[in-house]
Regions:
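N-terminal segment of the mature folded domain
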Residues: 2-132, 274, 309
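Short beta-strand->loop
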Residues: 10-12, 103-105, 123-150, 164-168, ...
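Extracytoplasmic/secreted proteins, especially bacterial periplasmic and envelope-associated proteins
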Residues: 14-21, 25, 49, 53, ...
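Extracellular/periplasmic catalytic domains that process cell-envelope and extracellular macromolecules
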Residues: 56-57, 92-95, 105, 116-119, ...
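A bilobed periplasmic-binding-protein/Venus flytrap-type ligand-binding module shared by bacterial periplasmic
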Residues: 98-107, 222-239, 256-260
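Short helix-loop capping/hinge motifs at secondary-structure junctions, enriched
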Residues: 106-112, 131, 144-152, 231-239
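Ligand-binding pocket segment of bilobal, Venus flytrap-like solute-binding proteins
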Residues: 150-216
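Extracellular/periplasmic juxtamembrane helices and adjacent flexible linkers that interface
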Residues: 232-311
């Protein structure tokens, strides 16, 4: 997940890339509340890596990351309050996405659902869930589909997901690398990706020659946000940091999210963008008893992903 660093003499705020459109509003908030100018710089990195930089000392006022687990890790370091997820609506996830497929124009391999990704003649592109937070949503979307299909048969789900990853042609370290592999290098038949990334490719990349396939069932991907309590209290920036996060939930903030291909929480904005975001059957991380349990079971050292990825 791309990120942006905003800072002035006393401000540094970590933001996901779509929030470039909110920067001018953030500047207004900062000037109104603190009468300070805010300088803008950019930094790019995955959710997990950004969390580590905050844990290791970068003084970010706000984090907006792909996984609640990454913010939990910062909270475990003592820099964010343990109850961070209850401080804002929707468990501090102001917008959502889901997991879809990108295929070649015309869908020559006739890929329609998760089952098709297990076929022997299909080359799959997806990032490594051990190194990419976003890729963990991809993996769990496939696992959840298999559980739904098999009446919660864990062995079936493991074999199903193993079949998909056996077809992975390139296992990049991050989502952007996988997108480049599929779209720019033209490797693979199908890319498992976040819906916002797929819509970005369709709408913003010239001569992309790809199209979106919506699976029958997927997962509700919920990027989460929080102020970094120790930093904002040290710098006296709690007011502007909280105002920024609250702005993400406002009608204007929700509109900006939708324009940048994230699913808005605001019902009125969602109705306006209903054509862009078709309804589909979505399950949540609760299907896996939360991120702590999902990580221990699937992505820890020696976990299920390590087991099934051995070839």
């Amino acid at each position: 997940m791309q990120a942006i660093l905003l800072y002035s003499m006393s401000h540094m705020i970590l933001l996901v890339s779509y929030t470039k459109s909110i920067i001018k509003h953030l500047l207004h908030i900062g000037q109104a509340k603190k009468k300070q100018n805010i300088k803008i710089n950019q930094s790019h990195g995955g959710s997990g890596k950004q969390a580590i930089t905050v844990i290791n000392g970068i003084e970010s006022d706000v984090v907006t990351l792909a996984l609640a687990q990454d913010i939990d890790a910062i909270a475990s370091s003592g820099k964010i309050a343990k109850d961070w997820q209850s401080r804002l609506p929707h468990n501090s996830a102001p917008y959502t996405s889901t997991i879809v497929f990108l295929v070649r124009k015309g869908n020559p391999k006739n890929i329609q659902d998760w089952d098709d990704l297990t076929r022997e003649n299909i080359e799959v592109i997806t990032p490594n869930p051990k190194t990419s937070g976003g890729a963990r949503w991809n993996y769990l979307a496939a696992w959840g589909y298999a559980l739904t299909k098999s009446n919660n048969d864990e062995f079936y789900a493991q074999q199903f997901v193993k079949s998909i990853y056996s077809n992975v042609k390139v296992l990049d370290t991050g989502a952007r690398g996988s997108s480049n592999t599929f779209i720019e290098r033209k490797i693979g038949d199908v890319l498992i990706t976040w819906e916002n990334e797929a819509l970005l490719a369709i709408n913003k990349i010239e001569n992309h020659n790809v199209e979106i396939i919506i699976p029958s069932t997927s997962i509700l991907a919920e990027p989460t946000v929080s102020i970094v309590d120790k930093v904002v209290d040290k710098k006296g920036t709690r007011a502007i940091a909280e105002a920024y996060l609250e702005y993400l939930y406002s009608p204007v903030g929700q509109e900006i999210a939708a324009k940048n291909f994230y699913r808005p929480r605001d019902k009125n904005v969602a109705i306006k963008y209903s054509v862009q975001f078709p309804e589909l059957d979505l399950f949540t991380i609760d299907k896996f008893s939360g991120w702590d349990e999902a990580h221990k079971k699937h992505f820890s050292q020696g976990g299920i992903f390590d087991q099934l990825s051995k070839r």
